[in-house]
Curated annotation (Swiss-Prot):
GO terms assigned for molecular function: ferrous iron binding; manganese ion binding; mannonate dehydratase activity
Enzyme Commission identifier(s): 4.2.1.8
Record PANTHER family: MANNONATE DEHYDRATASE
Keyword field contains Lyase: yes
Protein name per UniProt: Mannonate dehydratase
Keyword tags: Iron, Lyase, Manganese
A Pfam family of this chain: UxuA
GO biological process, one term: D-glucuronate catabolic process
HAMAP family to which the protein is assigned, alphabetical: UxuA (MF_00106)
Origin: domain of life: Bacteria
Length: 396
């Protein structure tokens, strides 16, 4: 596996020197300063590459070129946004960048309710609390029909939770959900968010899939033409939220992608933390079934709680993900590719990390502090090395 590190650009509190010292050779980044829907110019791409090259690093994976909301809703200037996306792919390929991660989650990117969940050892993790989320949906957002998405017990618990919240608690929870986490290109006020939700009133899963199909049929041929590997990221968490449909949550969804545009360039990001939240997702089976289309991996583990829709992020080798089995499956796919002449390792990054040690005193991007990811990368590297020595000695 190629060891990579997500970097949010020059304003990231984790420096490129830090990245290099962590042992990563590739960087996963994006041009966050370019507005959604605009073309990524070649000169901007080359400028970012030059910045990385100064530190002996390469831009391995784009994460992400954001998909404009008008593409998802099939409205407004969606055709122009698709054309701009196509051109951005061409420009990236012209600069030698051939792997692009993206997602098709409506409105919200990845979602958490608590960005500072205190663990028993004193470190902090990200958490999704189903009851806190229900309190937001039912009592803060006050979404029409929201009660249909929660059990009676969850509704009662949410009402009690909301009743105990201060104004500061309400503001913090609201901000955590709709203000935009790292990687999300848009944040909203409550009124803006309600207006966005209304745009999806007539869009169910079938319609969102159709809108996705239009997008895929437009961009995959361009990816084939210029040699770019597209890697769609799963929904996080992998189930409908706030009445919004989700279409990248299960192995059945992956099969739909393959059938809709059957091309090796129409591939996947295997995010074990996103898919792994669902107990019915067999991660090893997913890798074995779609191995030739897995172009990028995010490795992290989550811990489901008493309410199975609640979870927090565990250490990389702990939790509900059998990380050793996952890495073995990835290495098996790499070995298969080697035997066919494809010697490029699959890019991997340690996804998220606990805020710990000195990082507890620093301002960090939630989930993306340095030390927790450094620890995770070291652990994942150790598992990979042990498996290679034992089962895959021919892999470099």
């Amino acid at each position: 596996m190629e060891q990579t590190w997500r970097w949010y650009g020059p304003n990231d509190p984790v420096s490129l020197d830090d990245v290099r010292q962590a042992g990563a050779t590739g960087v996963v980044t994006a041009l966050h300063h370019i507005p959604n829907g605009e073309v990524w110019p070649i000169e901007e791409i080359k400028a970012r590459q030059a910045l990385l090259a100064e530190k002996g690093l390469v831009w391995s994976v784009v994460e992400s070129i954001p998909v404009h909301e008008e593409i998802k809703t099939h409205s407004g200037n969606y055709q122009q946004h698709i054309a701009h996306y196509q051109q951005s792919l061409r420009n990236l390929a012209a600069c030698g960048i051939d792997t692009v991660c993206y997602n098709f989650m409506p409105i919200l990117d990845w979602t958490r309710t608590d960005l500072e969940y205190l663990l028993p050892d004193g470190s902090k993790a990200l958490r999704f609390d189903q009851i806190a989320f229900a309190a937001f949906d039912l009592h803060i957002l006050q979404r029409a029909g929201a009660e249909q998405d929660y059990t009676q017990e969850e509704q009662q618990q949410a009402a009690a939770r909301f009743a105990a919240m201060s104004e500061a608690d309400i503001a913090k929870l609201t901000g955590n959900i709709i203000a935009g986490l790292p990687g999300a290109e848009e944040g909203y006020t409550l009124d803006q968010f309600r207006a966005r939700l209304a745009e999806y009133d007539a869009i169910d899963k079938a319609q969102l899939r159709e809108n996705m199909a239009v997008f895929l049929r437009a961009i995959v041929p361009v990816a084939e033409e210029v040699g770019v590997r597209l890697a769609v990221h799963p929904d996080d968490p992998p189930r409908p939220l706030l009445g919004l449909p989700r279409i990248v949550s299960t192995i059945e969804d992956m099969q739909w992608f393959k059938q809709t545009v059957d091309s090796l360039h129409n591939g996947f990001t295997m995010c074990t933390g996103s898919y792994g939240v669902r107990e019915d997702n067999d991660l090893v089976r997913m890798i074995e079934t779609f191995g030739d289309r897995i172009h990028f991996t995010h490795l992290r583990a989550t811990c489901r709680e008493d309410n199975p829709k609640s979870f927090h992020e565990g250490a990389h080798l702990q939790g509900d993900v059998d990380m050793v089995a996952v890495i073995e499956a990835i290495l098996s796919e790499e070995q298969r590719r080697h035997q066919t002449g494809d010697t490029r390792p699959i890019p991997m990054r340690p996804d998220h990390g606990h805020q710990m040690l000195d990082d507890l005193k620093k301002k960090t991007n939630p989930g993306y502090s340095a030390i927790g990811r450094l620890k995770g990368l070291a652990e994942l590297r150790g598992v990979e090395l042990a498996l290679k020595r034992r089962f895959f000695p021919e892999l470099p």
